[in-house]
Amino acid sequence: MDSNFHKHVDEALSRISSLIRKTPLQYSPSLSVKTGSEVYLKLENFQVTGSFKARGAANKLMILSQDKPERIITASSGNHGSAVANAAAELGLEVLIFLPKTVSPAKLNKIKLFGAEVVLTEADGRTDAETAARAYAEENNFPYLSPYNDLDVITGQATTAAEVLKENKNFDAVFIAMGGGGLISGMGGYLKQKISDVSVIACSPENSAAMHHAIEAGRIETIEHLDTLSDGTAGALEFGTITFELCKSVVDHSIT
């Protein structure tokens, strides 16, 4: 991670402030009692479109908007798509979002509500939608916005950690969701540059833990993915994603 990464994150937080919400950092009495420690929750469920994905999407789209692109292409299993559609509507940008045919109807309707055009791919998986989206973008010379395999997106997701440290710098460990690795590589990278002894613990759904298994194996592999309630952090990884090496460098422990 670039030694000035924390500065880029702070700049991103200022850049996207008009497009996101500052979410609460809330003490949890019940989890604190259960664990015998002080537990705080960063409530990104109160974020615009209901997910931290709003941060990375806003940062990348604001950067792309400087070149006034005719259209921007992305792929998603749902939450990233909603985030991109919302930010694009705010910025007056046209986006085309590739989604797997298995996307939940609620997430599909939410994306359409923001006015984005969608393409449902025949394949089931998120990475298949990503492959189709990348191919379409390259064929038509449009910019492609990855849900996680992009440093500007990662920097945007890391603004979550920047907000946390504005409220509380006294903690020993942080537990972060690890799907494609964009959130945890960004937050982990920022926190480790600010608090050298913080422990970063990755949390993945047992039924779909691609990055967890990749870190264990030392390489990205094709694994079986089963249904999970945590569909927002599920799915396979794009081979060659920058988040693999970033996650290896910042994750201290990984659990499912």
Pin down the residues of each PLM region.
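PLP-dependent amino-acid enzyme catalytic core
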Residues: 1-256
